[in-house]
């Protein structure tokens, strides 16, 4: 990529835009907009690699803007910046906007700089990648691993796999999941946050680092904003869906995940637009490291 990465910052507060432009104008080509509608027009007219939007704006929420920007510029990496812990906004930004990161105000300058550098590196790789011919396995059935004992979830996933000719695998605890993930290629993961009394979040975060192509859909009755934000940033989950299952919404999420999985099959791994954040909490980081180690050791034993 010969020209600098272009970043569009959108916020209704001009002082915020000035601060962001001042911080990043030396590394990137920075453009700013205080009007989300005008921001959408610029995305249609100009090449933009990264968009960073505030959530609470008078004319349109940041989550809605990022969802609409996805339709206009699907390859643009999307980041939500907000001073409020809003579960519904986070869910909308993830499920409809496909956000790369969720950052909070006041932002940490180093965290913001690191996040933008990760996004810019992905954008640069995408821009410089040669066009490659499709390979024969692009339409091969997907492998789906279910980590959920709920009968309704199982019924919906079984119907989806039967309709699409996909392969369904199940695990009933973390140990079974680790064995399956080492034995079998997995494209889609459907998981509750609790399985057999065990917390599945560390596994999801480990897989984001070990298997970037794997798409995770979380289906859970829990409504914890902070937990969701960590899953967005540290596990790069694809969807966050509520229980009890809303069949239409769940089926829509599965279909979108399958379409994304087929798309990513056609790309080299370094062009998959994912870069999971390392867990900030020491205990969680240790658990993730332990699972990554178990994945590696299992793989080594199976190869030997």
Regions found by a protein language model. Name each.
Residues 81-82, 219-220:
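Hydrophobic/aromatic residues positioned on beta-strands within the core alpha/beta folds
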Residues 34-35, 61-64, 173, 199-202:
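Acidic catalytic/metal-coordinating carboxylates
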Residues 2-5, 14-32, 37, 151-169, ...:
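Two-component/phosphorelay signaling modules centered on CheY-like receiver
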Residues 107-116, 245-254, 258, 266:
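C-terminal output helix
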Residues 121-153, 261-304:
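CheY-like receiver
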Residues 64, 85-102, 201-202, 223-240:
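Alpha4 helix (beta4-alpha4-beta5 surface) of REC/receiver domains from two-component response regulators
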Residues 32-50, 170-188, 192:
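Acidic, metal-coordinating helix/loop segments flanking the phosphotransfer/catalytic sites
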Residues 57, 195:
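Receiver (REC) domain active-site loop signature in two-component systems and cognate sites
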